[in-house]
Amino acid sequence: MGLQQEISLQPWCHHPAESCQTTTDMTERLSAEQIKEYKGVFEMFDEEGNGEVKTGELEWLMSLLGINPTKSELASMAKDVDRDNKGFFNCDGFLALMGVYHEKAQNQESELRAAFRVFDKEGKGYIDWNTLKYVLMNAGEPLNEVEAEQMMKEADKDGDRTIDYEEFVAMMTGESFKLIQ
């Protein structure tokens, strides 16, 4: 991630200083630009200007940032930001949540790159159709042939019968897989 400068949240917080203290974890996980962006979105939902957002608004707030968690992920996030179950959370809780989110996203990215390299042993930048089909039908929770082909067709956006890294990520994260049931 490189050298990060110490970031103070004070300039972006309009509520009592004691509820907006920077933690080292936040400064390591989020850039100044990210903090500014997230603080701006947080303030849009802070209807009363008191530095608090209703926990029920978390889904809309995340959606505005392009993050669409599942219901169970959302429930877990709500517990994390509203530990006292008061029905609201402050900017520090939200920024800490976003720091954790970014850390998990980075970990997932490195895991996906490593998995892709396992299948792209020759470093061609893609996985051929037959290799991927074999893996999908024989590893983990195996798919049947129809399911494997459907999944690959959804993932192979350019129709070249290979799966490049971007297509692989979309397939593995469920962004392209819509199995017809």
From Swiss-Prot:
<keyword id="KW-0106">Calcium</keyword>
<dbReference type="GO" id="GO:0005634">
    <property type="term" value="C:nucleus"/>
</dbReference>
<dbReference type="InterPro" id="IPR018247">
    <property type="entry name" value="EF_Hand_1_Ca_BS"/>
</dbReference>
<dbReference type="Pfam" id="PF13499">
    <property type="entry name" value="EF-hand_7"/>
</dbReference>
<feature type="domain" description="EF-hand 1">
    <location>
        <begin position="33"/>
        <end position="68"/>
    </location>
</feature>
<feature type="binding site">
    <location>
        <position position="156"/>
    </location>
    <ligand>
        <name>Ca(2+)</name>
    </ligand>
</feature>
<feature type="domain" description="EF-hand 3">
    <location>
        <begin position="107"/>
        <end position="142"/>
    </location>
</feature>
<keyword id="KW-0479">Metal-binding</keyword>
<feature type="binding site">
    <location>
        <position position="167"/>
    </location>
    <ligand>
        <name>Ca(2+)</name>
    </ligand>
</feature>
<feature type="domain" description="EF-hand 2">
    <location>
        <begin position="69"/>
        <end position="104"/>
    </location>
</feature>
<feature type="binding site">
    <location>
        <position position="162"/>
    </location>
    <ligand>
        <name>Ca(2+)</name>
    </ligand>
</feature>
<feature type="binding site">
    <location>
        <position position="158"/>
    </location>
    <ligand>
        <name>Ca(2+)</name>
    </ligand>
</feature>
<dbReference type="InterPro" id="IPR011992">
    <property type="entry name" value="EF-hand-dom_pair"/>
</dbReference>
<dbReference type="GO" id="GO:0030234">
    <property type="term" value="F:enzyme regulator activity"/>
</dbReference>
<dbReference type="GO" id="GO:0005737">
    <property type="term" value="C:cytoplasm"/>
</dbReference>
<feature type="domain" description="EF-hand 4">
    <location>
        <begin position="143"/>
        <end position="178"/>
    </location>
</feature>
<feature type="binding site">
    <location>
        <position position="160"/>
    </location>
    <ligand>
        <name>Ca(2+)</name>
    </ligand>
</feature>
<dbReference type="GO" id="GO:0000226">
    <property type="term" value="P:microtubule cytoskeleton organization"/>
</dbReference>
<dbReference type="InterPro" id="IPR050230">
    <property type="entry name" value="CALM/Myosin/TropC-like"/>
</dbReference>
<protein>
    <recommendedName>
        <fullName>Calmodulin-like protein 6</fullName>
    </recommendedName>
</protein>
<keyword id="KW-0963">Cytoplasm</keyword>
<dbReference type="InterPro" id="IPR002048">
    <property type="entry name" value="EF_hand_dom"/>
</dbReference>
<keyword id="KW-0677">Repeat</keyword>
<dbReference type="GO" id="GO:0005509">
    <property type="term" value="F:calcium ion binding"/>
</dbReference>
<keyword id="KW-0539">Nucleus</keyword>
<comment type="similarity">
    <text>Belongs to the calmodulin family. Calglandulin subfamily.</text>
</comment>
